[in-house]
Regions:
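Conserved alpha/beta-hydrolase catalytic His-Asp/Glu region
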Residues: 176-178, 191-245
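Conserved HGGG/HGGXW glycine-rich cap/lid loop of the alpha/beta-hydrolase fold
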Residues: 33-40, 44-109
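Catalytic active-site module of serine/aspartate enzymes centered on a nucleophile-bearing elbow/loop
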Residues: 275-311
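Active-site loop/oxyanion-hole signature of alpha/beta-hydrolase fold enzymes
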Residues: 28, 41, 47-48, 91, ...
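Conserved loop-alpha-helix segment in the C-terminal half of the alpha/beta-hydrolase fold
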Residues: 250-283, 289
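Flexible "cap/lid" loop of the alpha/beta hydrolase fold
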Residues: 152, 156-157, 162-191
């Protein structure tokens, strides 16, 4: 897997899992940070060579390299929500890249809530996909929660960039609980609200390195980003029909205990799209952290079937 135009990037918090590399991807929003793993040897094309867009073509009889995947994190999240999960994909022969969306963690954070519209997040995703060479060889796309809202829209806007779409713990339209999200986020994203959140988290810190990550991320994530994402979550459009018309293979998956979007909504969308539907055992809203091996099995099987023409 090659990512074009990248710049060096230090990890946000703590150490990276072995074989995971952190980079910055220049976009219209600024540099978005990303973590990736290659199932073989990670390939980075330096910024000075980014216009080359070189891709190896398999020789006759040689098996093509597995299609890489782009992973998009959810609301209040970042690439770190997938960093521990990347080695599970590599163990199953999959290369993948997760990035922090604009305003998340150590990614670029343009000033002003007007810079956090649905189209802005979608545009970033498309730029990252192109940096991964999707214009030449379409990639698998996965969006988690709010990231699924962005992924769904990106697949409709630029279906030619993607081999498949996985909608992970995300729904086609806002559930009832999301209606109050902008008001809640307005309170939590204020300076006082963020300090209170960080203090509350600090009272329960353990030796788990993710506790440190969550506390640090709560303080540095852009307030404008949180507000923009909150408003999107409360009113984003249902694009199920255009997604079906795109012809892209779709997987809908979530943890068995996930209640953010109703299970019935997931099942109805899967039926409408003709999508594969998988429920991950022993997991709730973030199966990549709660039962990573099971989720990796689901994804690897889906992607392998797509590449073999079995979907």
């Amino acid at each position: 897997m090659q990512i074009h135009g990248v710049v060096p990037q230090a990890p946000f918090v703590g150490e990276l899992p072995q074989e995971v590399t952190c980079v910055g991807i220049p976009t219209s929003a600024g540099v978005l940070t990303a973590a990736f793993i290659d199932e073989a040897v990670a390939g980075i094309v330096p910024k000075a060579e980014s216009a080359l867009e070189v891709h190896e073509v398999p020789h006759a009889g040689q098996q093509p390299e597995p299609v890489p995947a782009l992973l998009v994190p959810g609301f209040t999240g970042s690439k770190e929500d997938f960093t521990p999960f990347l080695p599970y994909l590599a163990e199953r022969g999959r290369s993948a890249c997760a990035y922090s969306q604009r305003g998340q963690a150590d990614s670029a954070a343009p000033k002003g809530v007007e810079n956090y519209r649905l189209a802005d997040f979608v545009g970033d995703l498309i730029e990252v996909a192109r940096a991964m060479g999707a214009s030449v060889r379409p990639i698998h796309l996965l969006g988690h929660s709010f990231g699924g809202v962005i992924a769904r829209q990106a697949a409709v806007v630029a279906p030619e960039l993607f081999r498949s779409v996985t909608l992970f713990s995300t729904g086609p339209r806002p559930p009832e609980a999301m209606r109050w999200t902008p008001l809640r986020q307005r309170l939590l994203s204020s300076t006082t609200g963020k300090k209170l959140s960080a203090w509350y988290i600090s009272q329960f810190l353990s030796s788990d390195p993710r506790d440190e990550l969550i506390a640090e991320r709560a303080m540095v994530t852009s307030e404008d980003s949180l507000m923009g994402a909150a408003f999107i979550l409360a009113r984003y459009p249902d694009v199920s029909l255009p997604l079906r018309q795109s012809g892209l293979p779709v997987l809908i998956t979530h943890g068995v205990g996930d209640t953010v979007w109703p299970e019935q909504m997931h099942r109805e969308e899967a039926a409408l799209l003709g999508a594969r539907y998988e429920v991950v055992s022993d997991a709730k809203h973030s199966a990549q952290l709660e039962n990573p091996a099971a989720l990796a099995d689901v994804l690897a099987a889906f992607w392998a079937d797509i590449e073999a023409g079995r979907n």
